[in-house]
Amino acid sequence: MSKSVYIVLVNYNGMKYLDDFMDSMHKQTYTNYKIVFVDSASTDGSAEYFKNTWTEAKTIIKKENVGFARGCNIGIEYAKRKKADYVLLLNIDTVLDNNLIEELVKYSEGERVVSPKIYSTRDKVDIWYGGGDLNYETGCHAQYHDERLEKENFDLCHEITFVSGCCMLIPIEVIKRVGGLDEKYFMYYDDDDMSLRFRKEGVEMRYIYSSSLWHKVGGSYAGKKNILTEYYFTRNRLYLMKKHKDIMRTSYHKIAKEIFEQKVYKAGANDKQYIPYVLRGICDFYIGKMGKSSCKF
């Protein structure tokens, strides 16, 4: 019998993405999966719509916005109780190729964590994620695109140091060793943190070129520069640097200074609106104010 995959979806007002997503799930060649739908107090009717439409899924509706990290952990705990073999963390603003789950499971043997090729356009012209690596100098990650793939002539499956939280398949035994997502991030940089923890535990991470999906980049704020992303990117990057200072090559104090110089002191006319939120991110990091921000975004 094929191994069981529990797909964890964290939803916040994702109504406009559900039909496309659900249609692609129905077409999967791999059928031994269960969806765990965790809703963070949506107000657009998406939780009720999903629950009534996909009755075989497990729907968990929270009364507050618990964030991506906490939402994933709720789904992960459910999967563990059900003795899942794998957990697939997946963004709801995606459309999957028919063989996505099948290919990921195939290449995850040996307790690997794997991520697929991710397109940013429906016509599959632009690759948004073609594998990635963490930069231990800056605390940021690089996602490889078409030009890197062609130049390096990558195989179907190659090792990476950053797996994308948009879609990552994790063997349940790895989760038991490494743990779930760090909820102090709330959103953003939680996948960077997981990637570093995988590395510290000796878990191999791989990019699977033969497995792909379309990510409607921006559906979960990804790809959008706004006051919300500027705050969380600033605060969480510094937290990541401090938490993993044992393997980082730059002091988080130095990174904080560089962020201030680049985004506050040298901010252009179009970026001055972000200055209060960058400063708030720096301040909240230093006073240890993590989790969901009290900022009114």
Give names to the regions the model predicted:
Residues Y33-A41, I60-K62:
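Short beta-strand/loop segment that forms part of the nucleotide-sugar
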Residues D23-N32:
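Short, acidic, metal-binding catalytic loop of nucleotide-sugar glycosyltransferases
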Residues T161-I170, V174-G180, K184-S212:
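A short, conserved alpha-helix in the catalytic core of glycosyltransferases
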Residues A84-V95:
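Short beta-strand-to-loop acidic/aromatic patch adjacent to the donor-nucleotide binding site
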Residues T94-W128, D133-N135:
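Conserved donor NDP-sugar-binding/catalytic core segment of glycosyltransferases
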Residues N135-T161:
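Short, flexible, basic/aromatic active-site loop/helix in glycosyltransferases
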Residues L228-N236, D246-F297:
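Non-catalytic, C-terminal membrane-associated alpha-helical segments of glycosyltransferases
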Residues K62-K82:
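Glycine-rich, basic loop-to-helix element that forms the pyrophosphate-binding segment
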